[in-house]
């Protein structure tokens, strides 16, 4: 039987709205109970948004659990803008640490959400400054020195991966804080010698401006040096967008966010996404008739053995 694209799109919208959205909402409740989260956002084009042109930029936000969580949760949320109020609304009920990049919107969140900066972004700024120099001038340049400081932190962090959060906290103060102190002292000295609008000047400005957030990871051994975990989770959506390019309607963008969320959460927990979604859709209609908490029972954490990826 040949099915039109419109028919298949309508099926996805209906399935998302009737069954998958409830599972998403149950995951959302669990996510907001975690002590440490990661956030990121990327642009998405939605053609038929009320009151906006078809070329307007909309956003897909991402929120996910950290490495200290027992069960991984990865949630996407479509919103028409990048306003901080969207993150605040999504994270209502959450109190804890939030890994994010340098976007100022995160810094306007309520005080019970403590933002942790991303050293991968800081290092990237120095890498960009290094890239503006001729090859023969890169070695021992200020940009190379700044990049070296950042890379030293990542190298030290690798050796702490298997420690408990308590042990990691102590080791960071012992090993990484001296590097941070030296880096800040160097950056403050370099600022006076560097053109503010140069690539190096921008890297130093980013470092100084973000310093209170970049050093937050020292306060809790559960925290991570970077927000790479969120960036990796955003990548499947970004790569998918290169194929489908845009969403037609806000409803379609919302359905995409729900479906991507369940697929990526399933993958993060070692489940086969197809088998997991099949299990959800086979059980949701019947369970929903008899059990008010049916969506909880269909979370990835409760999936049967046959939903898991085969061991290699």
Task: Please identify what each model-predicted range represents.
Residues 1-312:
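Catalytic center-proximal scaffold of phosphoryl-transfer enzymes
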């Amino acid at each position: 039987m040949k099915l039109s694209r419109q028919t298949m799109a309508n099926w996805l919208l209906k399935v998302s709205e009737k069954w998958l959205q409830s599972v998403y909402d149950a995951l959302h409740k669990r996510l907001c109970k975690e002590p440490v989260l990661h956030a990121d956002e990327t642009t998405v084009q939605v053609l038929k948004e009320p009151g906006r042109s078809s070329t307007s930029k909309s956003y897909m936000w991402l929120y996910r659990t950290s490495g200290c969580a027992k069960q991984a949760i990865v949630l996407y949320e479509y919103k028409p803008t990048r306003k901080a109020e969207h993150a605040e609304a999504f994270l209502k009920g959450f109190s804890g640490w939030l890994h994010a990049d340098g976007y100022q919107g995160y810094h306007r969140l309520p005080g019970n959400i403590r933002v942790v900066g991303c050293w991968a972004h800081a290092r990237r700024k120095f890498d960009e400054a290094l890239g503006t120099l001729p090859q023969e001038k890169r070695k021992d340049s200020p940009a190379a020195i700044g990049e070296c400081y950042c890379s030293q932190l990542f190298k030290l962090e690798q050796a702490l991966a298997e420690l408990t959060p308590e042990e990691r906290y102590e080791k960071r103060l012992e090993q990484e804080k001296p590097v941070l102190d030296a880096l800040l002292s160097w950056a403050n000295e370099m600022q006076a010698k560097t053109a503010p609008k140069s690539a190096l000047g921008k890297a130093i400005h980013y470092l100084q401006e973000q310093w209170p957030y970049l050093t937050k990871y020292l306060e809790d051994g559960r925290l991570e040096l970077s927000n790479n975990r969120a960036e990796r989770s955003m990548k499947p959506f970004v790569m998918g967008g290169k194929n489908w390019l845009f969403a037609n309607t806000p409803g379609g963008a919302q359905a995409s966010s729900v479906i991507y969320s369940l697929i990526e959460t399933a993958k993060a927990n070692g489940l086969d996404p197809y088998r997991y979604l099949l299990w959800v859709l086979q059980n949701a209609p019947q369970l929903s008739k008899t059990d008010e908490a049916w969506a909880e029972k269909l979370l990835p954490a409760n999936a049967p053995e046959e939903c898991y990826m085969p061991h290699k």
